[in-house]
């Protein structure tokens, strides 16, 4: 059995916020669970080429926007799932940070970070 608190896990600056990675590849669970903070007012061009991801909003507000401009509003109680390695923009409202519980499959190593200085969607 694995039991961990937020104070016991690694905190990674993923590029536009923080990610507390509760379960990673080394735990041999087959998935990652993270508590992800998205900085207020940030817009992140993201794509997970090797992972599927689902995010459940627990605090704050924001949007996830597809490359064709389709916009989905995020608020506590809303989940979105990237089931086709979708390129997308994750946007946090300027009023405050957005908090998500993120699940990745296959699991992350735990040290991954995004790079937003490229001309393409940041990926890992």
Regions found by a protein language model. Name each.
Residues 1-31, 115-124:
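A short, N-terminal "cap"/entry segment at the start of jelly-roll beta-barrel domains
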Residues 34-49:
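Conserved short histidine dyad/triad with adjacent acidic residue
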Residues 68-85:
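Short acidic-glycine-tyrosine-enriched beta hairpin
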